Amino acid sequence: MAIELDLQLAVEDQNGLPSAQDFQTWLDKTIPPFQPQAEVTIRIVDSQESHQLNHDYRGKDKPTNVLSFPFEAPPGMEMDLLGDLVICRQVVEQEAIDQDKPLMAHWAHMVVHGSLHLLGYDHIEDDEAEEMESLETEIMQGMGFTDPYLAEKE
């Protein structure tokens, strides 16, 4: 089975979005070293839906790039469902411009970053952030992208 993708496009204009194969490739390069089989939903949303979800689940009054919703199976129930990633198209596109990053690289980074959250990684504490960013960089470079944190390190 490997990694199963459920892609939901909840945006009116789907032009310029990564393909289902792009999303699948990014998941395939990120998740299997940690969990060989998994099902992940990626939902691409507009800023209004992202804003609402970010407000409801994180208490933040603005849209955000990616939200991760890990699935926790009830005790005794074995499931490969890892969770959901909700990615906001407008935020990702604006961040790519603001950070002077190639758009597809930033999309890939959001999938990698969100997937690591689904796998239990976090960046609240400095040591956790360092570990997570290091993994993100390693995965991104393994796919031929540059270090997504390069500008912050300079």
Curated annotation (Swiss-Prot):
Gene3D superfamilies: Metalloproteases ('zincins'), catalytic domain. Binds 1 zinc ion. Pfam families: YbeY. The keyword Signal does not apply. InterPro entries: MetalPrtase_cat_dom_sf_prd, YbeY, YbeY_CS. Its EC number is 3.1.-.-. PROSITE patterns: UPF0054 (PS01306). Zn(2+) binds at H113, H117, H123. GO terms for biological process: rRNA processing. It is found in: Cytoplasm. Single strand-specific metallo-endoribonuclease involved in late-stage 70S ribosome quality control and in maturation of the 3' terminus of the 16S rRNA. HAMAP family: Endoribonucl_YbeY. Belongs to the endoribonuclease YbeY family. This is Endoribonuclease YbeY. It comes from Vibrio vulnificus (strain CMCP6). The lineage of its organism: Bacteria, Pseudomonadati, Pseudomonadota, Gammaproteobacteria, Vibrionales. The gene is ybeY.
